[in-house]
Regions:
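Substrate-binding/active-site clefts of carbohydrate-active enzymes
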Residues: 1-27, 40-44, 49
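The substrate-binding groove and active-site-proximal loops of carbohydrate-active enzymes
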Residues: 2-14, 28-35, 87-90, 157-171, ...
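Alpha-helical packing segments of well-folded alpha/beta enzyme cores
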Residues: 12, 16-23, 171-182, 186, ...
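Structural scaffold positions in well-ordered secondary structure
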Residues: 23, 34-35, 55
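Extended hydrophobic/aromatic segments used for targeting, binding, or gating
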Residues: 201-233, 237
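Catalytic cores of secreted or luminal carbohydrate-active enzymes
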Residues: 223-265
Length: 279
């Protein structure tokens, strides 16, 4: 079980650590997702009571905290927002996104773990990211002013619910592309609950206040989307069966073990040349 806490910048680190100690000792919490003040990461990483507790932050300088050395137990994790940003750009075909895609596909720092995701509780669901280009948050009561305006989404030709076979087929293909990219990336993949079978919030990207069908997971959607649900299961099984997709070290893109080929390489139309410019 992971608990999410927000400690605003300026919160005394001693107080924040006391809060974490209470939840860890009293309720045996496995870890914490901590947002707000990322400077707490260094203090928490040195805390004896939290040495085996998973501590996930939005961002921090792991190289500085550990001085470039691999810790004996990697309990710090990065909620990899950069992954979501750049992989979504590549998924919808944005110009100049290929180089960033290849970087985030193989990124796995020595000092800490990275949690890769394409959707989480803050923003569009995965299905909505291929079905909506605009947020639809009027029901939240804030005149559609809440929620992010930069969602990096593409509706595949129609906004929201549609009966057009071509649009629906393209959305399914994009969902499969997204899951396959996630499952072939180094690091730890995170699938937001319901995304494994195409759950939708009808374009609401800030549904925390919707205690109704908008914010709930529609478990019946699994029966309506059996092809995609089966694909997700197969992609997870494929990842588990191939250790190269979740190695202990970040690929270097060179043949440093003298096997006759690099540990990872990228190719385009010409096998001998990797073109990193997509237009």
């Amino acid at each position: 079980c992971l608990m999410e806490f927000c400690f605003a910048p300026g919160t005394p680190s001693g107080f924040a650590l006391q809060v974490l100690h209470h939840w860890q000792l009293r309720y045996q919490i496995d870890g914490f997702h901590l947002v707000g003040d990322a400077s707490l990461a260094e203090e928490a990483s040195k805390d004896a009571l939290l040495r085996k507790t998973k501590l996930i932050f939005l961002g921090f300088d792991g190289a500085r905290i550990y001085q470039g050395k691999r810790p004996w137990f990697r309990n710090l994790g990065e909620h990899n927002q950069g992954y979501q940003y750049h992989i979504r750009r590549f998924l919808k075909g944005d110009e100049g996104s290929l180089s960033d895609f290849t970087y985030y596909l193989r990124r796995s720092p020595e000092t800490h773990g990275v949690i890769n995701y394409l959707a989480d509780h803050d923003g569009f669901t995965l299905y909505d990211s291929v079905s909506y280009e605009q947020k639809h948050n009027l029901d939240n009561g804030e005149d559609n002013m809440d929620g992010s305006n930069e969602n990096l989404t593409w509706n595949c030709g129609a906004e929201g619910v549609t009966r057009k076979p071509a649009v629906r087929a393209l959305r399914l293909r994009q969902l499969k592309n997204a899951v396959l990219m996630l499952m072939t990336s180094q690091g730890t993949p995170l699938i937001y609950g319901g995304d494994e079978f195409g759950n939708s919030q009808k374009g609401n990207n800030n549904a925390w206040c919707q205690d109704n069908k908008t914010g709930w997971i529609d478990w019946k959607a699994a029966a309506r989307n059996p092809e995609f649900a089966a694909f997700v299961k197969a992609a997870i099984a494929f990842r588990k069966a191939h250790p190269a997709l979740h190695g202990e070290r970040e690929p270097r893109l060179i043949d440093y073990k003298s096997y006759g080929c690099p540990d990872m390489s990228f190719h385009s139309q010409r096998a001998w040349f990797s073109q990193m410019e997509n237009t």
